[in-house]
């Protein structure tokens, strides 16, 4: 299933995730508790959710048991540790890019569902992108406009690869 575009998307996602987590680890720890439209979804909760969901998605591709879902502490060190977990997950999914595109059956929201491997892999990239944007928005809504999504887009990624 792998091709040059797909590989680039996954490398970009890995890079963008690390850029975001580096920024989050440098913020005042209080910022990790910021929320906006939904008080349950804080910056720290979303950061944890990226890593937890990655583990689930990898297990679906591998047809294995999902890893235990443990949230990292909402501290600078907790975010640094989470960044390592996300990096390992990103690398693992990239190793799986040549997995055959076939139906995978698993439990989602308590129901048995089936999706193609390619859909699960596309969701891996989309999910991280979606939540990086939400984190940037929440921080901006709390007068901390520190994550510029243009700085972690594909154009910026290519420039970083050239340097």
Where are each of the predicted segments found?
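Acidic catalytic patch
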Residues: 97-111
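Helix-adjacent hinge/juxtasegments
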Residues: 59, 63-100
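Short, contiguous alpha-helical
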Residues: 7-71, 111-163
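Active-site rim elements
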Residues: 3-9, 79-80
């Amino acid at each position: 299933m792998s091709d040059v575009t797909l590989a680039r998307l996954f490398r970009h996602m890995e890079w963008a995730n690390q850029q975001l987590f580096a920024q989050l680890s440098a913020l005042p720890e209080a910022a990790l508790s910021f929320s906006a439209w939904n008080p349950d979804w804080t910056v720290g909760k979303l950061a944890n959710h990226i890593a937890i969901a990655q583990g689930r998605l990898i297990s679906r591709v591998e047809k294995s048991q999902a890893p235990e879902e443990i949230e990292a502490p909402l501290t600078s060190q907790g975010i640094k540790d989470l960044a390592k977990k996300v990096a390992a997950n990103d690398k693992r999914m990239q190793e799986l890019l040549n997995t055959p595109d076939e139906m995978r059956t698993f439990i989602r929201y308590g129901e048995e569902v089936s999706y193609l491997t390619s859909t699960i892999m596309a969701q891996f990239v989309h999910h991280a992108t979606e939540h990086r944007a939400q984190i940037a928005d929440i921080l901006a809504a709390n007068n901390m406009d520190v994550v510029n999504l243009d700085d972690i887009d594909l154009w910026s990624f290519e420039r970083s690869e050239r340097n």
